[in-house]
């Protein structure tokens, strides 16, 4: 699931990190949240209709913006994930937004719902504050996407994430983000010229999440591939592709 990451999930990421995600990636492995709307492309993007877009932007956090994704996970099976911006308010230096995520897996009786709060700063950086899943709240410290100016194509950028979860438990992860550069991508929603970002999330326990995310200007995340590695062996994987995007 995204973060919707965030990651996506975890974010992907991170949230940063979401797809494989809010459920904790099963079997006690670290959750991956892929943050939707990670930094967009550095050059002109191409919409599904082939129209060049203006200079790239970070996540289009407008009230009512809605993304629908097809999810195919080796752990959870196939499903559909809907992500919607449900609240936006101005704050010092940017805006604070709330994102509602609903993941419905094939054969499940009810969807898995969770929310993410983040701040979209004027410089293009995004900072995640918390994620709420099934009544449980996970808070973050130093969890953010750097501003576009801070990402240099081909040069990895590393940061540290601290998460506080149930019963005050704290975990630390090291996140490396690399802007690979322009990349063409085709998903059910259309064909796009995107920016490909690669993330590596390493937990203190030794597990590692490898995340590839294709970002399109004005839309955000259109495709995410996540692989969870435990003890140097692939443990789980997921692919998330955009089927539709509706502006609020």
Each PLM stretch: what is its role?
Residues 15, 102-133:
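Solvent-exposed, charged interface segments at domain starts and junctions
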Residues 21-24:
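C-terminal motif of bacterial Sec signal peptides marking the signal peptidase cleavage site
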Residues 5, 62-63, 144, 149, ...:
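Solvent-exposed, flexible loop/coil residues
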Residues 26-115, 163-248:
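Acidic, serine/threonine-rich low-complexity disordered tracts
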Residues 120-192:
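Solvent-exposed helix/loop surface patches that form functional interfaces
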Residues 2-15:
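Bacterial N-terminal signal peptides that target proteins for export
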């Amino acid at each position: 699931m995204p973060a919707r990451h965030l990651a996506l999930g975890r974010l992907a990421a991170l949230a940063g990190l979401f797809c494989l995600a809010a459920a904790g990636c099963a079997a006690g492995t670290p959750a991956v949240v892929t943050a939707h709307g990670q930094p967009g492309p550095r050059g002109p993007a191409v919409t599904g209709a082939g129209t060049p877009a203006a200079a790239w932007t970070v996540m289009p956090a407008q009230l009512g913006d809605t993304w629908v994704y097809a999810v195919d996970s080796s752990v959870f099976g196939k499903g559909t994930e809907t992500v919607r911006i449900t609240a936006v308010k101005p704050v010092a230096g940017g805006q604070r937004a709330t994102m509602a995520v609903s993941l419905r897996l094939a054969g499940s009786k009810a969807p898995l719902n969770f929310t993410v709060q983040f701040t979209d700063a004027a410089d293009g950086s995004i900072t995640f504050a918390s994620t709420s899943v099934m009544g449980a709240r996970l808070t973050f410290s130093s969890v953010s996407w750097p501003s576009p100016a801070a990402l240099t194509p081909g040069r990895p950028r590393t940061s540290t994430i601290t998460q506080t979860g149930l019963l005050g438990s704290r975990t630390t992860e090291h996140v490396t983000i690399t802007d690979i550069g322009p990349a063409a991508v085709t998903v059910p929603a259309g064909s796009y010229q995107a920016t490909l970002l690669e993330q590596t999330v390493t937990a203190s326990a030794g597990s590692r999440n490898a995340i590839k995310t294709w970002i399109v200007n004005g839309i955000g995340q259109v495709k995410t591939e996540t692989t969870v590695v435990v003890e140097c062996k692939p443990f789980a994987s997921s692919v998330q592709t955009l089927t539709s995007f509706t502006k609020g």
